[in-house]
Amino acid sequence: MMAYMNPGPHYSVNALALSGPSVDLMHQAVPYPSAPRKQRRERTTFTRSQLEELEALFAKTQYPDVYAREEVALKINLPESRVQVWFKNRRAKCRQQRQQQKQQQQPPGGQAKARPAKRKAGTSPRPSTDVCPDPLGISDSYSPPLPGPSGSPTTAVATVSIWSPASESPLPEAQRAGLVASGPSLTSAPYAMTYAPASAFCSSPSAYGSPSSYFSGLDPYLSPMVPQLGGPALSPLSGPSVGPSLAQSPTSLSGQSYGAYSPVDSLEFKDPTGTWKFTYNPMDPLDYKDQSAWKFQIL
């Protein structure tokens, strides 16, 4: 009977010793046993002879290597770790002494450095960015050149030099007046198309007034536009458009034309069986010896 009264063996659950049927240790109110408190290391007290050895090595170098620390530790009968900690504390003490010396050398008012006064946003004049500046400075420094007289040679050079070769001289006033084509001369031969040399188009003023001019072949195509416009036809070669000034309004060009419109200028042929003959000019830059190549039959 006494065997049943004795408590059973101890069981360990999660490293906790349980005594038989008792489960009081598993209750929430019972805390787990805490780790033992780490003991504080005792402070090391250095003797005068030990301090002399350490100070002598510190005077040589503030960062001794492990071999120098072990050698000193053997002399003063201390572990190497204590020597390492002593050098660490000695360097910190040396830095603190240097900072105190710097503070003593500075004057009393030198510690508080005078800061520059901050400028207020409204006091300083700042350039306004509302208006974009002129990058080319046209509004201040540029002045347009004065327009020359209508009959000045410089204007003629600016007008005619675009179309004339570089080897030719500017046309005088008398020749510029001949550039304007007359109405009857352009409409006299509506079906004849003559190819003149390129030099005649640039230099010869008579080429624009003769039936064999460069633009005589364009007349049949330009004249039928007159009834559609409801007024006189516009002429690209009329009046002052080739003269001194090219800047004319469309209203000033509306009254200039080749001449009176005639039914002869239409595109319809009077004789459907007729042929169109292209007159060959020996001055043509295209060297075609066979003139029969310039004739064709309209079917």
Curated annotation (Swiss-Prot):
Residues 93-155 are annotated as: Disordered. One of its GO terms (cellular component) is RNA polymerase II transcription regulator complex. Keywords: Activator, Cone-rod dystrophy, Developmental protein, Differentiation, Disease variant, DNA-binding, Homeobox, Leber congenital amaurosis, Neurogenesis, Nucleus, Retinitis pigmentosa, Sensory transduction, Transcription, Transcription regulation, Vision. Residues 97-114 have a biased composition (Low complexity). CDD domains: homeodomain. It is found in: Nucleus. InterPro entries: HD, Homeobox_CS, Homeodomain-like_sf, Otx_TF_C. Interacts (via the homeobox) with NRL (via the leucine-zipper domain). Interacts with PDC, RAX2, RORB and SCA7. This is Cone-rod homeobox protein. It comes from Homo sapiens. The gene is CRX.
